[in-house]
Curated annotation (Swiss-Prot):
Originating gene: rpmD
Protein name according to UniProt: Large ribosomal subunit protein uL30
Keyword Cell division (UniProt): no
Matches recorded under PANTHER family: LARGE RIBOSOMAL SUBUNIT PROTEIN UL30M, MITOCHONDRIAL RIBOSOMAL PROTEIN L30
One GO cellular component, as annotated: cytosolic large ribosomal subunit
Alphabetical list of InterPro entries matching this protein: Ribo_uL30_ferredoxin-like_sf, Ribosomal_uL30_bac-type, Ribosomal_uL30_ferredoxin-like
GO molecular function annotations of the record: structural constituent of ribosome
Annotated disulfide bonds: none
GO BP annotations, alphabetical order: translation
Keywords associated with the record: Ribonucleoprotein, Ribosomal protein
Length: 65
């Protein structure tokens, strides 16, 4: 299973650790989207910036097409 993560709010007024977490996920601008594996480490990162992102589950079959 994979997760599609979309940055929906700005990083301007966020704490440094939240900005670094978003950058580690590959999110730098509003409406950036990344697809990551569903792992505990990614869940921890999402929890840190949960108020800034929208997360959707994506099945692996959609990724292969």
């Amino acid at each position: 299973m994979k997760l599609k993560i979309t940055l929906t709010k700005s990083l301007i007024a966020c704490r440094v650790n939240q900005i670094k977490t978003a950058h580690c996920l590959g999110l730098k601008k509003i409406n950036n989207q990344v697809i990551k594996d569903d792992t505990p480490a990614i869940h921890g990162m999402i929890k840190t910036i949960s108020h800034l992102v929208v997360v959707e589950k994506v099945s692996d079959t959609k990724e292969q097409k």
